[in-house]
Amino acid sequence: MVSKLSLYLVTPPGFQPGKIEAQLIGDRYQIKLLDYGQKFLAFLEANKEQIDCLVVVQGKENQDYFECLTQSGILLPCVFLGPTTACEISQEDVSEQLYHSAEKYLDFANLENLSLTIDQAIAQFLHLAPSCALSDKPQDPHHSDPDKTHQAFLLLQQRRLAEKLRERLGYLGVYYKRNPKYFYRSLSPEEQQEFREQFVADYRDIVLSYFSGDLPTNQAIDQFVNQAFFADVSVSYILETHMKLMDEFAQQLKLEGRSEEILLDYRLTLIDIVAHLCEMYRRSIPREDLPFELLFRID
């Protein structure tokens, strides 16, 4: 089961978060609500390793709370939501940063961009260096710089989040590691001929072993689908390969005086392989709102 990103929606007491939650419908997120109060800091301290991103409605309490988080070395991806004026000031004036230099701001009027902004906040957080973790505003002289423990937590949090994103994105990172020069259409005529012969031979082995149990069929199918995926082979090419092989088998059965009906069972093999390949291609299609820097960061 693919892990969901754990979001904590932080609001002032009495705030109705319905419009915000409506922008986060789907299977990407697990959303929990949290309001400012005496237990706010204690809760974040106790659960900091389970939080993937904070979505914070700006309020009067923001500055004090997030200064405490910064001084405690609790650094998490964060999106601040607020009115236009507050967002514009915070984005343009570094001194207005409340938490750290990777925080993001979003105007309430643009809530439809919330999912994108969360992705951007996570991407910037993954690029956050331990030495640049805190905001660039002057530090309180009564507090020392973040110690090695705080820096270690940041690195741990980045690694944990990157692993979850790698799982969440599935084959997406692998997709961008494919080398186009190895695509079937990019091969020379001789290489294409060699590829076709090996491709048909592998498919024949899978078909013949599918119902016999002689070979580890699941492993063979996985290897075959990987071969097709990295060669950018289309589903129609696999279908064509299957039909040619079935014609060959049909002729052999006809010569032996046997019924061709058994060949209908081999459609299960085709369905199994096509389903595997389609799932790989489906999961490798990047969402339009996914920052490319996020892809490169988790490679």
UniProtKB/Swiss-Prot annotation:
The keyword Ribosomal protein does not apply. It holds the Pfam family KaiA_N. Residues 170-178 are annotated as: Flexible linker. Keywords: Biological rhythms. Residues 179-287 form the KaiA C-terminal domain. Key component of the KaiABC oscillator complex, which constitutes the main circadian regulator in cyanobacteria. Complex composition changes during the circadian cycle to control KaiC phosphorylation. KaiA stimulates KaiC autophosphorylation, while KaiB sequesters KaiA, leading to KaiC autodephosphorylation. KaiA binding to the KaiC CII domain during the subjective day yields KaiA(2-4):KaiC(6) complexes which stimulate KaiC autophosphorylation. Binds oxidized quinones via the N-terminal PsR domain, allowing it to sense redox changes and possibly mediate clock input. This is Circadian clock oscillator protein KaiA. It comes from Picosynechococcus sp. (strain ATCC 27264 / PCC 7002 / PR-6) (Agmenellum quadruplicatum). The lineage of its organism: Bacteria, Bacillati, Cyanobacteriota, Cyanophyceae, Oscillatoriophycideae. The gene is kaiA.
